[in-house]
A protein has these predicted regions:
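Residue-identity detector for glycine
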Residues: 14, 18, 29, 36-41, ...
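Active-site-adjacent substructure of cysteine-protease-like catalytic cores
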Residues: 71-122
């Protein structure tokens, strides 16, 4: 019970990891959307609340945490290359972003190159129906994500990160 209480307390600050993992699993075909919903944003919270909590909690499971640790040792450009390779192979990931403000999880859906910058286009469950982007500067090994928020409805700001440890991936 103590572990469950700790997980519930931690989950109170946001469920983005559970939501992004479940959204990716829907997209990859590992899970079926309930009630015939055509898009993740059309799903009623009550029908997926337990799944969101379950997938959120898996981030502390030893195999998932070890996988995350491997990715956190990579630079932003190395993470970007992993995303590119994953998109080509249709291997889904969630992308974790860590700044001085906190952490957030999004779903990478495309990557483009523009000079020294890579644009990682993402689905952010705080902004249903919108495509956002994380800009990675390959020269400085930094990233920027405009209008990031810790949870839906929370105040947003521009987040930035530098070097290894500021991003990670969760493999599906």
């Amino acid at each position: 019970q103590a572990v469950a209480d700790q997980l519930n307390a931690a989950m109170a600050s946001g469920r983005c990891e559970g939501m992004s993992v479940l959204a990716q699993r829907f997209y990859d075909g590992f899970e079926s959307r309930p009630n015939g919903a055509g898009a993740t944003s059309e799903i009623a919270q009550a029908s997926v609340a337990k799944q969101i909590g379950y997938w959120w909690a898996t981030q502390v499971a030893p195999p998932v945490a070890a996988n995350s640790k491997t990715y956190r040792a990579m630079t932003p450009v190395q993470i970007t290359n992993e995303i590119i390779n994953g998109l080509r192979a249709r291997s889904g990931f969630t992308l974790g972003l860590y700044s001085s403000v906190g952490g957030h999880s999004v779903n990478p859906i495309a990557v483009t190159k523009d000079g020294d910058n890579f644009n990682i286009y993402v689905y952010d469950n705080n902004y249903p129906g919108e495509i956002r982007k994380v800009v990675v500067n390959s020269a400085s090994q930094t990233w920027t994500y405009g209008a990031a928020a810790l949870s839906s409805g929370a105040a947003s700001s521009t987040w930035t990160g530098t070097g290894a440890g500021s991003m990670d991936l969760t493999s599906m």
